[in-house]
Structure formats: structure tokens, C-alpha cells
Amino acid sequence: RYIICGHTHMQGFVSDGKKKIINAGAVGVPLKSPKKTQYMILTSDGKDWKPEFLSLEYDVDTVIKEIHESGLWDASPYWCRITEHLLDTGELPHGTVLNHVMKLNDYQDPWYNIADSYWEKALDELGIR
């Protein structure tokens, strides 16, 4: 009767009258929720479960600073730039950017072998600094 999930990174509730799908959102990198973390509290009235969707601001600047300090930026600069943009704006998830990069590359190479020039062009076209 209930499906509770969170992998889409967006809070939401859908029902067809019989089944209810409840998405708690994302604590780390939510979509459409810049500089906020998301969670959900489920309460029961004894008959049904009701979701309460909550969002809290958190210190995104510290998270970004820690990404730089961890060395991850050096190992994966494009992933880090996309993540920073997503944390700041709530827009352009990694999959969307990856699809754009692969399209620019005419789907000729696997994602892990695509030249940096395609990544740079994609991030520039999408407005990711």
C-alpha cells in the first residue's frame, strides 16, 4: 500500500487511490531546494500514514569548503563543480549534465573517457562556473 523512497532527490507524494508513493527528498543534495536539506516525518492517525515534508537551511559554504579541502576537487573537478552548482541553486543534477556532455561528444566515448574539452563546453553552456 505504501512505497517510501528518496533516491530522486525531490520530495513528493503520489497516489492512485490504492497505492501511495512518498518521497522523503534528500538530506545531502536535494533538487529544487537550494541550500536546504530535506526530510520527512510520517505520522499515523491509526488508520493512515500522513507525510509532513520539512526543509532546513544548512551551511552549504562549509560543505563546499570541505569538498575542496578533502582533495576531491583535484580528483574530480567537473563532478565538484556540478555539485557546488547544485548545492547553491538546486538545479542541474549530475545526470542532466552528463547527458549534455555525452551529446556534445556524439555518444562516441564512455562517460569516463570523455575529453575535458567536452566537459568544459557543457559546463559553460549550462552556466556552471
Q: Where on the chain are the PLM-derived regions?
A:
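Active-site neighborhood of phospho(di)ester-bond hydrolases with catalytic His/Asp-centered motifs
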Residues: Y2-H9, I21-G25
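Short active-site oxyanion
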Residues: R1-Y2, K50
